[in-house]
Regions:
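Residue-level marker of positions within ordered structural domains that often coincide
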Residues: 5, 50-51, 140
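Short N-proximal segments of mature Sec-exported proteins
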Residues: 31-88
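Helical anchoring/docking segments at protein termini
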Residues: 4, 17-22, 153
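Compact alpha-helical subdomains of small soluble proteins
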Residues: 75-153
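Extended amphipathic alpha-helical interaction segments
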Residues: 30, 55, 59, 144-152
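Generic detector of short, well-ordered, non-transmembrane alpha-helical segments enriched
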Residues: 13, 41-42, 131
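Short N-terminal segments immediately surrounding and downstream of signal-peptide cleavage
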Residues: 18-36
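Sec-dependent N-terminal signal peptides
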Residues: 3-14
Length: 153
């Protein structure tokens, strides 16, 4: 029985690791060149910000609101990229995007809770903090692009 449990743990952990991976390995140039990667990163950033929002909202509502706002800012861009990749209408893209985000948010929350039990911190010993910074860089790049576009028009 113990062998079966150990085997299941080895099988289950790589599956989770495939879903939750370090985002900050990718550079912005790669995102500009690959729509599928752009979708993956935006979906992951929305999910990560949503997970942090859920985990801290009771103890730190103001801080949670900042993560919530980041997720909401990035969501429309994820929907637009998915719409382009799959050549689907807006309603189908929204539905698929939010289903993907919901699943990945739950995975991030599980990952952070497990880490919290081990390290007494959601972030310590993981790449989550780096990825939050990376997601903020993505958001800032989008905001800058929008601002520059408005200036030209």
């Amino acid at each position: 029985m113990k062998r079966l449990i150990i085997i299941l743990l080895f099988i289950a952990n790589p599956l989770k690791a495939e879903k939750i991976e370090q985002l900050s390995w990718y550079n912005l140039q790669e995102l500009l060149e690959d729509d599928k990667l752009t979708y993956k990163i935006i979906k992951s950033c929305v999910s990560l910000n949503s997970a942090v929002t859920e985990l801290i909202k009771d103890e730190h509502p103001n801080l949670a609101n900042q993560f919530f706002n980041s997720a909401n800012f990035l969501s429309p861009f994820g929907i637009l990229v998915l719409k382009k990749i799959k050549n689907i209408d807006n309603i189908a893209a929204e539905k698929e995007f939010f289903n993907d985000v919901d699943r990945l948010t739950k995975d991030y929350m599980s990952f952070m809770r497990e880490n919290g039990v081990i390290n007494k911190s959601f972030f310590k010993g993981t790449f989550i903090g780096e990825d939050l910074n990376y997601c903020n860089e993505i958001r800032a790049a989008i905001e800058t692009t929008i601002s520059e576009t408005k200036k030209k028009n």
